[in-house]
Amino acid sequence: MADLTAWRALVDKELAGAPFDKLVQRTAEGLAIEPLYVEAPARATRPIGAASFRVCMRARPGEAAEHIDGGADALWLDGDDRDGITLAAKRDVLVVVDRFSTERFVPFEVEPRVVWLGFDPLASGLQLGPKIEQFWQAVSRAMPPFATGEMRNIRVSTLPYHAAGADAADELAIALSTAVAYLRAMNGAASQLWFQISVGRDTFGELCKLRALRVLAAKLFAASSIAAAIPPIHAVTSSRTQAARDPWVNLLRVTTEVFAAAIGGADLVTPLAFDTELAEPSALGRRVARNTALVLRDESYLGRVIDAAGGSYYIESRTDALAREAWQRFRAIERDGGIAKLIASGALQARLDASWATRAAAVAKRNEPVLGVSEFANLDEHLPSAPSGAAHGHRDAEAFEALRAKYASRDVVLVSLGTPAESRARIGFAKALFATAGVRAREAETGQIVCLCGSDDNYAAHAASVAAQLRAAGATKIALAGKPNGTAGVDTYVYVGCDVIVALEELLA
């Protein structure tokens, strides 16, 4: 294309010799995000005529009526909440039921048309380890009573893998391998499958993940000569993105995640309450979460648009790239013996640990910011000192929240080198950085824990001598706000791109 060639020539001119790849971003999966997408759109990946999504609320015993009366048309219940199940059946509300045991599975009488059973032994096995074999035995005993009707009984959930650190491609690969394991283990499983998947912070990446899941499920069924319809998708906003600090920001996180789920083509969407990490979700938290999804569906009309992202070459290209990467990873899992073998051997957990370590490093360096926690921390909020532990697995905010719980009482002094104009920018930077640990840094001439703030020229001329004077005055730890420069007497450096967790642990411990 002539226009594209001309554009590339202008870009190369502006880059002045720098590589074009400087403009190409990389996802956590290593996939390229190009700076410009101009080709003709690809075919949409969501079936034409797909229905609107249901708002599916996670309900504790006694909360079913609250959610139904508030507008929810699906409930996610524990199997023990038989009153909630009965109520939902009477009102034509779809019910997702978590109900299984390592020893036995207890069926219950209810209208088949309203229930999806959350029977997913492999996902549970990630947490239960050796007990996974008991789950396999439970599957064969439990399935016969539910082999007919419109119920869906076999859940393929990536929630525990997402919480453990899986990236999007791994989530999809694990979902496919889990589905294959169930298809092999149980006759007629194809019509009983449904997917449950987390939706995280990357709006475009996450909606592409849901679209890719449909593409991959269709490819898997075609390769297996299965004529069943593609399993429906239950999207759940991510527990990994929830923060205990400045929890009001979770309202915005959940909003973008519900949006991604809706545009990605989810059949059910569960929004988590903004205060999930503080304690059991409050009535306000539950109401706001429910209304967030209802507003997006009914007032913003996301539920009335068929495949809103279809036709965008950017979306279609990212979906295709993610699907291809996930398919390759799925094949690798199968070559290694399948998902059950990887779980039992601990290989999958090791893989997820490595993935989480990469993500945690990006969060620690604030390349992946957590607003209200690693950026723009609120020093005046008064919340429980530790999260409730409601979510299993990891959360993006966990390391910074732990830092704040340990060191919020520390006294940090900022010592200015040079004029106010020369030191103002780095003083502001240092105050914001120490706030992530709950520390209200103050400007003074000396203290036990000190951070030098000034210009590079002033550092070169005065930092070493000032550090020596501070040591003589009783300073035990000295930091410098700037890139490492070998200044004598400085213990650590804080700067944009540094590992904030490591730097503050060294300084505040």
Each language-model region and where it sits:
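Glycine-rich phosphate/diphosphate-binding loops that line cofactor/substrate pockets in enzymes
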Residues: 68-69, 189-191, 402-410, 445
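Hydrophobic/aromatic ligand-binding patch that stacks against planar heteroaromatic rings
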Residues: 66, 260, 374-381, 433
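Short, acidic/polar
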Residues: 60-68, 251-258, 426
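Short acidic low-complexity segments
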Residues: 441-447
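Active-site capping/gating regions of soluble enzymes
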Residues: 182, 194-375, 476-484, 492-508
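Short, acidic loop-beta-alpha module within alpha/beta folds
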Residues: 65, 208, 412-440
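Intrinsic disorder at enzyme termini
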Residues: 1-8, 14, 18-25, 29-43, ...
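Catalytic alpha/beta active-site cores
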Residues: 1-198, 202, 231-232, 268-272, ...
